[in-house]
Design a protein with these regions (language model features):
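N-terminal secretory signal peptides that target proteins for export/translocation
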Residues: 1-4
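Bacterial N-terminal signal peptides
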Residues: 6-19
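Alpha/propeptide regions of enzymes that mature by internal proteolysis
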Residues: 23-269
Length: 269
């Protein structure tokens, strides 16, 4: 998904996580830019995140519980939900929107209305595949609290929920993400620095045979091209080890001595 500021517009791209609300303690790792590798040609925004676009807020609820062998319906739990709020009062100040599907193995509810109407009027949520309906309920509950006239004297809504399969690391049958988890992510959504990696919807994801998860970036266009800020947020859960490249260079040969990749399907992003 991408957001652009300076005349706000919205694009959703499908190339195609006891209740725990505390943020996990994660190892701080260097970003690829901190390692001296620069991706792309345009400069990044201040945060190099989707929240460089004015008004955009992101929130996570991360669920980690249990260890050991899978017990369907119980755990271990490695999942969560991530939400993107395009702007304040988006119901009354809608943003132009569109979609593009590259990999049809991912699903996203609410796209039919976006394609028909050409705008977005509520937050986007990301989560695991089997939790998508419950997460949609959470978005609806939050929206009804914010806008009590929905479905009575105002229009109704179809929540936008994108899913990825985290069943390799998570007890997906347990559908552990609750409506309260979704509301927590929405209520705690903020601008500024975004937690990345194994957080929110990315908690149980894997990519290119390694641990995947949430990533974000931004670019600032030249003034001659409008000076817009373009922000992107992804939930990476795709790719085989041999497909991983950085700046066009295959990475698989450099990982021949590490753990063999455990990838069963193409996945989605």
């Amino acid at each position: 998904m991408a957001l652009c500021g300076g005349g706000l517009w919205f694009i959703t791209a499908l190339f195609f996580f006891v209740e725990v609300h505390a943020q996990p303690v994660l190892e701080v790792r260097q970003t690829i830019r901190e390692l001296g590798i620069s991706i792309g040609t345009f400069p990044t925004g201040t945060l190099n995140a989707i929240t460089d676009v004015p008004g955009v807020r992101v929130g996570h609820t991360t669920l980690r519980k249990g260890h050991g062998a899978l017990v369907p319906g119980q755990g271990p739990v490695r999942t969560g939900v991530t939400v993107v709020i395009p702007r304040d009062d988006v119901w009354n100040h809608k943003v132009p929107a569109g979609s593009f599907v590259l990999n049809g193995t991912g699903e996203m509810t609410g796209l039919a209305w976006i394609e028909e109407a050409g705008f977005l009027e509520y937050p986007i949520a990301l989560t695991n595949t089997l939790n998508a309906p419950l997460v949609g309920n959470g978005v609806i509950s939050w929206m009804l609290k914010q806008y009590p006239a929905i479905g009575i004297t105002d229009d109704t809504l179809t929540p936008v929920v994108a899913e990825c399969d985290d069943s390799y690391l998570n007890d997906s049958q347990g559908r552990h993400v609750t409506e309260q988890d979704v509301v927590h992510a929405l209520e705690s959504a903020s601008s500024g620095t975004i937690a990345q990696g194994s957080v929110g919807a990315g908690t149980g994801m894997r990519s290119y045979g390694f641990k995947g998860g949430i990533g974000t970036s931004s670019r600032v266009l030249p003034e001659a091209d409008g000076g817009h800020v373009i922000g992107v947020l992804v939930n990476a859960n795709h790719g085989r080890r041999e497909q991983l490249t950085i700046l066009g260079h295959p990475m698989a040969p450099h990982f021949s001595k590490v753990q063999a990749p455990l990838q069963t399907t193409e996945g989605s992003i």
